[in-house]
Amino acid sequence: MVFSSLIFMCIFLPIVLIAYNLSKNLTYKNTVLIIASLFFYAWGEPIWVVLLIFSAFVDYINGRIIDKYYARAGATIALVSSLVINLGFLAMFKYSGFFIENINTFLHTSIPNPNFKLPIGISFYTFQTLSYTIDMYRGKTRVQKSFLGFLAYVSMFPQLVAGPIVRYSTVASELNSRRVTADDFAYGVKRFTAGMCKKVMLANSSGAVASMVLDSTRLTVASSWLGIIMYTFQIYFDFSGYSDMAIGLGRMLGFHFGENFEYPYISRSITEFWRRWHISLSTFFRDYVYIPLGGNRYHAIRNIFIVWLLTGLWHGASWNFIFWGLFYGVLLFIEKTLFKKKLQKIPAPICYIYTMFFVILGWALFYFTDLNALWTFIKSAFGVGTALYDLTAVSTFCTNAWLIAVCVIASTPIPTIIHKNFCKKSKVFAAISEPILVIVGLGVCFVLLVGQTYNPFLYFRF
């Protein structure tokens, strides 16, 4: 089940919200949340509910042990147990096939490939439960004594299958005591609607164009860049839209999740881009891998490449994701060692062009899982053995020029700034604009969803 589906919006969500708000106390609310979340998760593949509950139980027990034996050997054993079991499951389901396939290729062996199916959302909820046990071990959060409360945290459907990665410490107090105000609920509806509009109106439309162009067997320079630019819009509006919907749903239920995107396409450097893109993942690797390895103080270059190798692998068990991670590792290494503060002295437009050129090129590594197809695209993009443009590329651009313009504007703070300025000038506008925008936005999304067949969330596969 996906947020941008009629069954979710018309049946699942209304039933959950009614049952949740009719619940008289926190125990009932958590129970409703757990039942709804497990049903939501089981909609995709029921068997993986068992793994989800088992993972939650393992780290609930490990958390209790760490609390009991804090700063003693027992706590260390529990932390190691958490790391081994969680990362072991992740490695088995996500990476075993990739490593066996490459061992067979390079060593000419014939080890059977288990071909495990990837449990939905395992990369996200694994990091969430690890954040709990690691923070418990560091003394940065308090133990959750109720398994019901902990399972509610791990299985919470708004962010279960595609993030953002919500650390336990972020919602710990709300698991034990929360209240949904009218303002919270209204903000949640507004935020959910904004995310839905991003997904249905912009991501799906951009994705359809990107697939049509990039999957063509005859790429020109113009069509290569047009296709990957449309994919650049698709992945941003798809993932940031999902994050907006998750944040909105969380607010409707009384939870305050952190922001996951801060207009990354206005960044003036790659470093700034990663402060704005998928914030929950980049800060996770910063706090739980980069800083423990020594951060900027010891072996900074080594630490950068380790983190970005892991970041690439987190996104997928494929060479293109490894190269994508190392691609950013190299760029960040160059910025930290060679550019340092020089980028601040360069005119902003040049910095924007520099940043977006490499970001867009990076998405090619993300899009093409087949390395031969990737190499074909790179040659086409830089004019090796292909024409500059053809009539199909020109026609596709002209047909979708309006979409490109809307995507460019929507990926900046401009619409928000304009709306806030109008709200300051007119109290009447401020009072009626948001309800009207929500109603119109949801109405348009409903109409589009009825007729659309292209509706994937890209980050579901991670």
Per-segment meaning from a language model:
Residues 1-461:
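Membrane-embedded transmembrane alpha-helical bundles that form the catalytic cores
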